[in-house]
From Swiss-Prot:
Substrate binds at Q85, R91, N123, P124, V125, D126, D151, S152, A153, R154, T233. Pathway: Fermentation; pyruvate fermentation to lactate; (S)-lactate from pyruvate: step 1/1. Homotetramer. This is L-lactate dehydrogenase. It comes from Moorella thermoacetica (strain ATCC 39073 / JCM 9320).
Length: 317
């Protein structure tokens, strides 16, 4: 599929994440039309009306509430529908309830837009990305999850505050599960190509291992901290999704830590969906990058994959 003009996207679910994503996409010239689909159609209508009014102040874009049939012609299906994570819950606690929602809704949506890419957002996103791939019959490159794109941004944010450097000049990734077993890749983190420890030494300071442990903890716990305080995460994930969508529609070939189905990589036996740095363009996932990991990162990634595989095995797919 070649590079195309402004596209139509379908947003399934108009909760905090779905509506925040729609709002973020109002500012993207790459999106010309958005259809909002929700089991609560009145809620979708209200969100669409509000967004359509806002669009008048930004640029011409068509926003409306629809049914599955109205998803016809969509370039990307953004699946946010699902039960929200509550305070004290892990993302994995949502597995059976949200798997049932994906199984019920996604096939009908794709019936009307069989050429679309699927961007899974609902949690647990890695498992639901795998479920979406399995039940849709789509090739692996066309079923993506938001993965650890936001986690990687959180990692860079915390590093930027510590090192007092623009986060756009920090290269650092979080891989594996979007959740409790995620793996910050410290061995490759750098500022403009300069290893973090060397960068710190330039100021005559020495980095302590305790610092890395604390930053890793903060990245992992960030969503829980936000949910405890405001009940939901929305803005960060909405902009992470906007970034992924623009990367696809602009055919950027950018490196993003999306979740997708992989098999037999990094010593992981069998198949699983998890996040790794991938080239992303208008075909979806174009390539999974084989980044060099140190032994403990490889072990942590394998543990993350095994955790996800054990949970997937509990589902009848």
């Amino acid at each position: 599929m070649g590079l195309q003009g402004p596209a139509k996207v379908a947003i399934i679910g108009t909760g905090y994440v779905g509506s925040s994503t729609a709002f973020a996409l109002l500012f993207s010239p790459l999106v010309k039309e958005m259809v909002l689909v929700d089991v609560n159609h009145a809620k979708a209508e209200g969100e669409a009306m509000d967004l359509a009014h806002a669009a008048t102040l930004i640029r011409p874009v068509e926003v409306y509430a629809g049914r599955p049939a109205d998803c016809a012609g969509s370039r990307i299906v953004i699946f946010t529908a699902g039960a929200n994570q509550q305070p004290g819950q892990t993302r994995l606690d949502l597995i059976h309830r949200n798997t049932a929602i994906v199984r019920q809704a996604l096939p009908e949506i794709l019936h009307y837009c069989p050429e679309a890419l699927v961007l899974m957002v609902a949690n647990p996103v890695d498992i639901l990305t795998y479920v979406a791939w399995k039940i849709s019959g789509l090739p692996e490159n066309r079923v993506l999850g938001s993965g650890t794109v936001l986690d990687s941004a959180r990692f860079r944010h915390l590093l930027s505050r510590h090192y007092r450097v623009d986060p756009r000049n920090i290269h650092a990734y979080v891989i594996g599960e979007h959740g409790d077993t995620e793996v910050p890749v410290w061995s490759l983190a750098n500022v403009a190509g300069v290893d973090l420890e060397e960068f710190y030494l330039m100021d005559g300071m020495r980095e302590e291992e305790a610092f890395r442990v604390e930053i890793s903890h903060q990245v992992r716990e960030a969503a829980y901290e936000i949910i405890e305080r405001k009940g939901v995460t929305s803005y960060g994930v909405a902009l992470a999704l906007s970034r992924i969508i623009e990367c696809i529609l602009r055919n950027e070939h950018s490196v993003l830590t999306i979740s997708s189905v992989i098999r037999d990589l990094y010593g992981i036996d069998g198949e699983v969906a998890l996040s790794l740095p991938c080239l992303v363009g208008n075909e979806g996932r174009e390539k999974v990058l084989a980044i060099p990991l140190v032994a403990r990162e490889k072990a942590a990634l394998k543990h993350s994959a095994t955790t996800l595989q054990q949970l997937i095995a509990q589902l009848s797919l």
